Amino acid sequence: MNLSNHFLVAMPDMEDAFFSQSVVYICKHDEDGALGIAINKPSPITMDMIFSATGKNIPMRMQHDSVMMGGPVQVDRGYVVHTPIGNWQSSIGVSDNIALTSSRDVIENISREGAVDKALISIGYSSWGKGQLERELADNAWLTVPADEHILFDIPYEHRYAAAFAKLGIDPLALHGKAGHA
């Protein structure tokens, strides 16, 4: 099972302080573990803080975007999920069109026409060790659904959890994570 380019959708009864009602975009998943970015948890960092550090102006299309809290790991670093993939110093290709980049050059060029079409900026990331995510899935902590660029980039962050459930065709109020296994 490879969940790269999928959303993890937290079950409604998840009690973890950070991951409760989270949607996590999985950027890398292999036998060694998984790495993702929470796409619906705003951070206290502003776009102005991010772009002023590079001496660049915030692109008009991102003026009202929030910087996400991507996860509890390396919260002192920035990460950008973006299209198109491009040629950046430190990127992971997630799909044919989406990459996760952690190098400053993507931020410095994000306002340049055509360099980046769509972007979600976060601080920190989410990580699971070898077999950890698979155990959490077996324990009914998460639902999975193929990622959707519209949810990832276009829907306001506060509506992404509901949108992910809608993509699953499930009413979150009808779920309970303590189901048994046959």
UniProtKB/Swiss-Prot annotation:
CC annotations in GO: cytosol
Pfam families, A to Z: DUF179
Annotated InterPro entries: AlgH-like
Source organism, top-level taxon: Bacteria
Similarity comment text for this entry: Belongs to the UPF0301 (AlgH) family.
Protein name, UniProt field: UPF0301 protein NMCC_1249
Organism field: Neisseria meningitidis serogroup C (strain 053442)
